[in-house]
Amino acid sequence: MNKFSVSGVNDGLVSPMHSFLEALMSDNTIPKTVERVALNIRSKDINSRFQPIEIQLERTSSKTPWQLRFIATFDVMVAGKPQKELSLYFNFAGCWFYHPEIKQCSLQRPEVQTLLASWLKAITHTLITQPAISIKITSVH
């Protein structure tokens, strides 16, 4: 079982976030020497409207919990060739949030916490119900 540390979220989001991360990593064994990983979540269906997601986790040693660094989602623009544009960026390490229309603000803002809770609920539902989702875990150097 993996252990996680999540900062910058209200108490009501800690347990759902731990469950979400545990579910993503449950079928994967990560070597003890790896200190940072990226989880890339994509749809296998190229016609899907599913937004690609990148989640990064970091730890100082195999004996310490994984710390959630960030969650980023991307809009995919298709005009000849696929192109990704940052949509949502929850930076837990720095405790800030970014969206292209509102720019950067505190992760602690109530409306950002509400957005994160809604996003977490929606993505968890999608991962459970959509079989055409791939999760690739790679080490980051």
List each model region and its residues.
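Amphipathic, interaction-prone secondary-structure segments
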Residues: 26-67
